Amino acid sequence: MSAKAPRKKIRWDLWMIVTVGVSIFYMLFLLYPLISMLSKSVIGEDGGFTWQYFAKVFHKKYYQRAIWGSLKISATVTLITVLLATPLAYIMSTVKIRFAGALQILILVSSMSAPFIGAYAWIMLCGRNGTITNFLLNTFGFKLGDIYGFKGCVIVMSLQLYSLVFMFVSGAFKNLDNSLIEASESLGCSGVRKIFKIVLPLILPTLLSGALMVFMRTFADYGTPMLIGENYNTLPVVVYKEFLSEIGSSDGMAAAISIIAIVITTAVFLLQKYIANRKVFSMSALHPVEAKKLHGVKNVLAHAYCYILVGLAIMPQCYVIYSSFRNTS
C-alpha cells in the first residue's frame, strides 16, 4: 500500500485572512439578500410555495407597463448617451480643445451627484415655475416645454450619465494605434467612412461596456423617475410603492418584481459580453492618436459642441451650489 500524501496545511497569512474576510462579506451582503429576496418571492402568505406573485406581475397591465417603461427608458438613455459621448470623446482626443483639462474635470463632476439632486435641480431650473422657464417666458414670451414625464427623465438621465460612456471611449482612443487610421487614409478611406469602417469597430467592445454601465444605472434609477416621472412608472418606483404601500405593503410582490429586474439586467449583461467577445481586438498603441489643431468653421463647431454639452450637463451642480448660498428669507 502506498503511503497517503500529507495534507497541505492552510497558511493563515495576511492574504488568506483578507480572502476569507472578503468571502464572508460577499456572502453576507450579496448572496444572503438575494437568497432572502428569492425566497420571499415564492413563499405565499400561508407559508407555502407559490408562483402567485410572478403570475400577478405578468398578468396585470400595471406591472407590464412598468417593465416596458424601464426597458424603454433604459434603451433610450443608453442610445442618446452613446450618440452624445462618442463624438465628444473623439473630438477631445483628436482635436486640440482649449481648456480640455477643465472640461474633463467638469464632465466627471457632472456624474458625481446623486440622481435625486440632479432631478431636483432640473425641476428648479426647468420646472413649471423654474428659473429658466420664468426667464424665457417673461423675457421672450417663450413657454418652455414640460420637463416632466418620459422625455424629462430621458433628458436628465442622459446629461447625467453620458460621462460614463465618455470615460470608457476616451480610454479606448488613448489605446488606439494611429498608424491604422493613417493606413486607411492612404488607401482612400477618409472622413465619415473612416470613422464607421475603422474607428468604431476598434472601440466597439469598450463602447459596449460604457453603454452597459449606462443601461444598468438607468434601469436601477429610482430618484429621477420618482421626482419628475409623474405618472411614468419604472420597476424601482413600483418596487418602492409595493414595499411601502398605503393600502397594504406586499414584500412578496416587491421581491418578485426585484427578481424580474435582476433577470433582465443579467440577460442584458450576458448579451453585451457575447457581442463584445466577438469583436475583441488586441493592439499596442505604438503610435497613439494625437490631438491636432483645426481651423475655421470646423474648429468653431468642435469647441461649440464640447462647451455646450458640458455646460448643459454641469448646470444642475452649478445651480445647487448657487442655491446653497442664496438668501431666501
Regions found by a protein language model. Name each.
Residues 124, 222-248:
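Glycine-rich helix-loop "coupling/hinge" segments at transmembrane-helix boundaries
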Residues 240-264:
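Helix-loop-helix hairpin linking two adjacent transmembrane segments in secondary transporters
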Residues 60, 95-98, 174-179, 189-191, ...:
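Juxtamembrane helix-boundary/capping and inter-helix hinge elements in multi-pass membrane proteins
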Residues 7, 270-305:
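Alpha-helical transmembrane segments of integral membrane proteins
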Residues 48-59, 230-242, 329:
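Short hydrophobic, aromatic-rich alpha-helical segments embedded in or entering the lipid bilayer
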Residues 187-189, 201:
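Glycine/proline-centered hinge or cleavage motifs at structural transition points of membrane proteins
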Residues 11-45, 59-174, 202-222, 256-272, ...:
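Membrane-water interface segments at the C-terminal ends of transmembrane alpha-helices
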Residues 1-12:
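Short, Lys/Arg-rich, polar N-terminal cytosolic tail immediately upstream
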